[in-house]
Amino acid sequence: MSQEVMKVQDIEVPKGGKKQGYLRISERPAGAHQIPLTVINGVGDGPTLVINGGEHGSEYHGPAACLRLQTELNPKKINGKVIIVPMVNTLAFETRWMHGNPIDYRDLTGCYVPEIQRGGSGPPLISYQVATTFYREALSKAQYRLNLHGGDLEEDVMEGTMYGRTGVDEKRDNDNLALARNFG
């Protein structure tokens, strides 16, 4: 068995290991802006999967599922790697803010580089900082992603699974369809 290490920012996890930590986004007056995550490196080779919740601050089912999964998933029983991010939009969660965040009012749903604009010549918008860091450190390392939503407070969401077809890579599109079907 090789000793391949999975690295996400300064978190390093050897094969068969699991480690919790934070993605550092930026500094703010109240302290560092960070996003919690768990990195799991299975014993065997395989693809990398990102599972995230909390793109909206008042969606609780996705983060709850992520927290349970990061506790229960045993790296000794899986192949490949899993990056679990229970709460992407921590600023919205801290304030129970629906649809975006309370700082720049941008919605992160599916909007990762290059869709979220930097925001002029001054410091970049916080949503841009979150999106670029999450993309660079997690999404760009993965072949697959489960983005868990549960509906904001005022929404009545029917149960279902959606997946995206790129129209560019037929194998990836078919793999995404199979993943969505297996997920339910």
What does each model-found stretch correspond to?
Residues 1-184:
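Structured catalytic-domain cores with a bias toward divalent-metal coordination
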